[in-house]
Amino acid sequence: MSRIPIADPDIGERERERVADVLDSGQLADGPVVREFEDEFADYCGAAHGVATANGTAALQTALEAAGIGAGDTVVTTPLSFVSSANAIRLCGARPVFADIDERTYTLDPDAVEAIVAARDDVAAILPVHLYGLPAEMGRLADIAREYDLALIEDAAQAHGATYEGASVGTLGDAACFSFYPTKNMTTGEGGMVVTDDRGIADRAARFVNHGRADADEHGYQHVSVGHNLRLTSLAGGLGLAQLRKLPTYNARRRANAERLSAGLADVPEVTLPTEPAGRRHVYHQYTIRCTDRSALRSHLDDGGVDTAVYYPTLIPDQPAYDGFDPAVPTARRVVDEVVSLPVHPGLTDADVETVVAAVADHYGRPDAEVSADD
């Protein structure tokens, strides 16, 4: 029995050509193809500057460092995300403070954020995560950041091409961070990017990922600050350029698959479907439903050849590395036990989508659920 995977990276001839071009050039590390990728990805987002990084976690730490976040600061973020969202804060010497989430969108609840910010005098930044491909409530969060003079750093690792009120994620705060891990909406294998309209942040980020190097002397080895080696390779940059050309098509297919899944599951009341609030464009890095019998549903789908995943089974503050963090996040604690993601990637055929719908419906004793040919 062939299985329907939860993710299926699409690497084609154009990607192979781009990688071969880099190999032929002999510039395998931080070459001109990386500068080209930075420029094109920033332009895609509508941002002025792009700084490529080795991975998405590096992008987060780089953006925070470039925004001046460090020891003595706290950063408000979500408890429901991959652990890197909080790890990057701690790697800067700052401390994450976890605010609760909205029950419909699973992104930061602005009211919870404002309550924390108003009660503390050490908050320096807000780091919202555009979870599963849906932008957070950036209008309210931007208002809070302005009122309290805070940095606003977007974790857009799962949201390439998503928009909020017509503006692309990546342009909704002081800086934004993307990941190009293989399961993301586009991939470079491993890789990340910081995008920003702030030239100062861009310059500091570029130095931070390259040993604090300014290249201001005749030998090219002037280091004006302490940094890391977090550069993206040229091989990854070549992959990124090829993948970026396909991203609009990938996202359109993800959205079409999501619409068909939602249409087919609309009459299965045991599951809560993803939402797309007015003014926000979801790019469905994940199609995440909620149910109260997650293990049983996953087992049934596994028996039927449908892969699923849980993003994420444990809240960040409940991880062993976060012992001592005990935030009041009742909504997140309820949601974390119920979320499960179904296949939605662009490699799915219409028949695959129908199989997923049928398997979920069958588990709940609703075998008549189907995807309409008109959807």
At which residue positions do the language-model features occur?
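Helix C-cap/helix->beta junction micro-motif
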Residues: 92, 147-148, 304
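A short hydrophobic/small-residue beta-strand
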Residues: 75-76, 89, 96, 152, ...
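Active-site phosphate-binding strand-loop segment of PLP-dependent enzymes
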Residues: 104-188, 193-195, 341
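Short beta-strand->loop structural element characteristic of the AMP-binding/adenylate-forming
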Residues: 95-105, 309-311
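Generic structural signal for small/hydrophobic residues in well-ordered secondary structure
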Residues: 19, 41, 59, 75, ...
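Phosphate-binding glycine-rich loop
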Residues: 27-74, 88-91, 98-100, 167
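PLP-dependent aminotransferase class I/II
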Residues: 47-48, 111, 125-128, 134, ...
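N-terminal "arm"/small-domain region of PLP-dependent enzymes with the aminotransferase-like
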Residues: 1-27, 32, 224, 304, ...
